[in-house]
Amino acid sequence: MRIILLGAPGAGKGTQAKIISEKLNIPHVSTGDIFRANIKGNTPLGQKAKEYMDKGELVPDELTVEIVKDRLGNVDCVNGFILDGFPRTIPQAEYLDKVLVQMNINLDVALLIDVKDEDIIKRMSGRRVCTNCGATYNVVFNPTKVEGICDVCNSPVIQRADDAAETVLNRLETYHKQTQPLINYYEKAGKLKVAEGAGEVDETSKRVMKALGI
């Protein structure tokens, strides 16, 4: 199954992608991870992306699509993938469609994990991340056993700058302007499925599996 994951920042896409990945035995392809891997590996595509990022500029859609295309061409994507973090705009979706046609890949589902803004703000402003191992917690839903200390490696946990309430509001505003139109785009293409993302992870997972017909 070939899946694109849609949803606001903090909707739980990464968590659900991991669950789907394990259930279907297909890779979770996170564009953020691909960028980091290409830059760290000093690949030609990574070098190009780094030039833009070092100047504080956005990586052009054409280059992002090339990086995604390169990853989807890997052998582990033959039986499917979960693409998370791309596309974010209509032009990106159109670029991706062209690339998938070139690769003879048919997209099965664009899955929207739908969460209300107020729930997103609650989730994200309460999120804490370990400074060492990257483990994620939430002061309301999933607190550390010892306040401020990671359960896994005993390092300090912090609130990332982009999880502060004001920043979350700005990110949601950007999401609604840029990414929301994708919902209409994939609905018109007959690819859209929606799963309610509020509540516990297990509850959301059941709704996700139902939406995917699994």
Curated annotation (Swiss-Prot):
Organism superkingdom: Bacteria
EC number of the protein: 2.7.4.3
Cellular localisation: Cytoplasm
InterPro entries, per database record: Adenyl_kin_sub, Adenylat/UMP-CMP_kin, Adenylat_kinase_CS, Adenylate_kinase_lid-dom, P-loop_NTPase
Reaction(s) the record says it catalyses: AMP + ATP = 2 ADP
Pathway named in the protein's UniProt entry: Purine metabolism; AMP biosynthesis via salvage pathway; AMP from ADP: step 1/1
Keyword Kinase: yes
Binding-site list for Zn(2+): 130, 133, 150, 153
Domain notes: Consists of three domains, a large central CORE domain and two small peripheral domains, NMPbind and LID, which undergo movements during catalysis. The LID domain closes over the site of phosphoryl transfer upon ATP binding. Assembling and dissambling the active center during each catalytic cycle provides an effective means to prevent ATP hydrolysis. Some bacteria have evolved a zinc-coordinating structure that stabilizes the LID domain.
Family to which the UniProt record says this protein belongs: Belongs to the adenylate kinase family.
Record's function text: Catalyzes the reversible transfer of the terminal phosphate group between ATP and AMP. Plays an important role in cellular energy homeostasis and in adenine nucleotide metabolism.
NCBIfam families found in the cross-reference section: adk, PRK00279.1-2, PRK00279.1-3, PRK14526.1, PRK14527.1
Protein's recorded name: Adenylate kinase
Organism this protein belongs to: Ruminiclostridium cellulolyticum (strain ATCC 35319 / DSM 5812 / JCM 6584 / H10)
